[in-house]
Amino acid sequence: MKATIIFLLLAQVSWAGPFQQRGLFDFMLEDEASGIGPEDRAPDMPDLELLGPVCPFRCQCHLRVVQCSDLGLDKVPKDLPPDTTLLDLQNNKITEIKDGDFKNLKNLHTLILVNNKISKISPGAFTPLLKLERLYLSKNHLKELPEKMPKTLQELRAHENEITKVRKAVFNGLNQMIVVELGTNPLKSSGIENGAFQGMKKLSYIRIADTNITTIPQGLPPSLTELHLEGNKITKVDASSLKGLNNLAKLGLSFNSISAVDNGTLANTPHLRELHLDNNKLIRVPGGLAEHKYIQVVYLHNNNISAVGSNDFCPPGYNTKKASYSGVSLFSNPVQYWEIQPSTFRCVYVRSAIQLGNYK
């Protein structure tokens, strides 16, 4: 009888599947549960590579996303999984990005370093990131943009830093770049090198808002579709500053000190659809609106406009070749709404699209 029981037990063991160790932490926990100490274990340790990548201490890892945000880290964690595609390090206390911090992260697509204390980035820190597309550096202490950014980069956001210079060299070879965000930096016009953005052939969106620039940056790429320069100290819009921007669809110049827009400026942006010039010091409606074929939204509220001509917005008669306006704002200007001829807005899509009001 005893022999029969032993035989059945041996058979059951032989039918069981092979033991599979799930991870290093499982291995350690099983030791604790069983009371087995190092002296009781065979001297051969498991190959760590077979156990798979280990998530950095206190971070969370899931589906090639490594989240190490809000941990009070003062440096980039070591031994990041090499298959990581998104690394989130925001809201920490990192002060410096060093060479080797991102070694072996050849598959990283997105790097989030927002809201740290970074003041220095080594020139070769991003060199290993051969597939990086999105780099978020906002809310740090950078005085310049990093050098040798990956040529695969498509989106760079570095607002709310201490950047005073934008050199053309930092963007050399970045032919895939689409979005550049540099708002809320102590930038001056003299700090932006002429043609700094010109080499980026696919650049579509630039935002340099809430800085100290007094002019529109020169040498902007013709691929640009949106230009946001709100909240600066620009005093005038020269026709030459927008020359060649044939694809520009949205121009944001709100909250500046603009008193004049040169004649011919709008002719240099033939596909413009939205023009934001509210909260400036304009004394008249910019010229060229009536002749512009595609423009549909014009914000001119909170200016010093004292008169509006009957042909300021629409061409004489009813020109069906011009797109109808879907939004025109003129409130908070000295001009009284009853002084404006009803025919002035003959090319507006609906009357509700017109915003008029008394001057305060």
From Swiss-Prot:
Keywords: Disulfide bond, Extracellular matrix, Glycoprotein, Leucine-rich repeat, Proteoglycan, Repeat, Secreted, Signal. Disulfide bonds join C55-C61, C59-C68, C314-C347. GO terms for biological process: negative regulation of angiogenesis; negative regulation of endothelial cell migration; negative regulation of vascular endothelial growth factor signaling pathway; positive regulation of macroautophagy; positive regulation of mitochondrial depolarization; positive regulation of mitochondrial fission; positive regulation of phosphatidylinositol 3-kinase/protein kinase B signal transduction; positive regulation of transcription by RNA polymerase II. Residues 1-16 form the signal peptide. The attached glycosaminoglycan chain can be either chondroitin sulfate or dermatan sulfate depending upon the tissue of origin. Glycans are attached at S34, N212, N263, N304. One of its GO terms (molecular function) is glycosaminoglycan binding. SMART domains: LRR_BAC (SM00364), LRR_TYP (SM00369), LRRNT (SM00013). It is found in: Secreted, Extracellular space, Extracellular matrix; Secreted. InterPro entries: Leu-rich_rpt, Leu-rich_rpt_typical-subtyp, LRR_dom_sf, LRRNT, SLRP, SLRP_I_decor/aspor/byglycan. LRR repeats lie at residues 74-94, 95-118, 119-142, 143-163, 164-187, 188-213, 214-234, 235-258, 259-282, 283-305, 306-335, 336-360. May affect the rate of fibrils formation. Belongs to the small leucine-rich proteoglycan (SLRP) family. SLRP class I subfamily. This is Decorin. It comes from Canis lupus familiaris.
